[in-house]
Amino acid sequence: MTQDEMKKAAGWAALKYVEKGSIVGVGTGSTVNHFIDALGTIKDDIKGAVSSSVASTERLKELGIEVFECNDVIKLDVYVDGADEINHAREMIKGGGAALTREKIVAAISEKFVCIVDDTKAVDVLGQFPLPVEVIPMARSYVARELVKLGGDPAYREGVVTDNGNIILDVHNMQITNPKEMEDKINGIAGVVTVGLFAHRGADVVITGTPEGAKIEE
């Protein structure tokens, strides 16, 4: 089974968490694209979706799924999204696709976070994947210096502007042994919009695409 086939297995398995008549929180990325395709097969059974990115919104609309604004929804039953890394405590690094802030907002209003990944994303310690930080442009240099003080090696993600009009710093060479503490420290830096650590709001369910098919941990 290829990596993409494992992603597809995880994405389609997430359909079991979608309630009839509900509005579904939808994340961003290659694994989520498979979930969106799966969602298209039951579009008449759901009310619609709240999307975490422009890219996902476009894909949902192409399939005829109504997309609601986050401000118009009080809560969501389920949010389905991928991760760049996930540890045994279901804490994650997200934001490889630069949608981390909107992903965090949609996760915050959701009762259940279903994380869909292939089996290359599971790690013992977070940090091998560069940690994305969304930053207001005028604060880029200051935030980079502060991230160095925390032991990281930040790199400006050239040519990327987030859906919110901000920039991304990717922090390399971090071993994040206490993700909740690191999330708080980075979020406390002036000019940081948010960091791609999902530790305080981790996953409730993890669906992993493996060569044998989808493995579900609740």
UniProtKB/Swiss-Prot annotation:
Positions with a binding annotation for substrate: 28-31, 81-84, 94-97, 121
GO molecular function, one term: ribose-5-phosphate isomerase activity
Record Gene3D superfamilies: 3.30.70.260, 3.40.50.1360
Enzyme class, UniProt record, top EC level: isomerase
Swiss-Prot/TrEMBL catalytic activity: aldehydo-D-ribose 5-phosphate = D-ribulose 5-phosphate
One term under GO cellular component: cytosol
Biological process per Gene Ontology, one example term: pentose-phosphate shunt, non-oxidative branch
Signal peptide, first to last residue: none
UniProt keyword Isomerase, yes or no: yes
Superkingdom of this protein's organism: Bacteria
Keywords from the UniProt entry: Isomerase
Active site residues of this protein: 103 (proton acceptor)
Pathway(s) per entry: Carbohydrate degradation; pentose phosphate pathway; D-ribose 5-phosphate from D-ribulose 5-phosphate (non-oxidative stage): step 1/1
InterPro entries membership: NagB/RpiA_transferase-like (IPR037171), Ribose5P_isomerase_typA_subgr (IPR020672), Ribose5P_isomerase_type_A (IPR004788)
Similarity comment text for this entry: Belongs to the ribose 5-phosphate isomerase family.
Quaternary context: Homodimer.
Function statement: Catalyzes the reversible conversion of ribose-5-phosphate to ribulose 5-phosphate.
PANTHER family named in the record: RIBOSE-5-PHOSPHATE ISOMERASE
Protein name: Ribose-5-phosphate isomerase A
Source organism per UniProt: Vibrio parahaemolyticus serotype O3:K6 (strain RIMD 2210633)
